[in-house]
Amino acid sequence: MIVFRKKLGSGLYIRKFDRYINADTSGDHSSDNDDPSRLEGYLDNSWSSEGSITQVNRSNTITELDTHVICGMFKPDVSGTWQFRLRCDDAGYLWIGSNAESLEWDLNKSNALCDGGGGHPASNADGSISLTAGVYYAIKAMVGDRGGGDAFIIDFSGP
């Protein structure tokens, strides 16, 4: 599947948490212990002064053992199956629709559209979902860095 990068509409914003999503910060750990509930109470309130963002390419910006979360709304211009790609290093997840409406620490990784969990070098996690034109859908993506570089890119394409 080829997914082309597009600019996202305003209304997306970023939140930074001073904690890694997984208690295991060793090498290429598995995603078994990736746990969004670890983020509760670790929101960095003094950090997010960027306001809304219009594209997601957060590579080389995540501090080691931090987690960044992109939140907002996605409004497709065409009905049909949309492809999403999350490029992440390390643990990363992307949710669309009602699965994305929870607070970050209440998200369920088992219903993520894109699942790039665990410790690993930059890699892609792909997913597709049927969306209706003109409807607003919640979108949330989370990437944590355990060290050794980072990547956080969201790409998408419509039908």
Which residues does each PLM region occupy?
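Acidic/polar, compositionally biased interaction segments
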Residues: 6-159
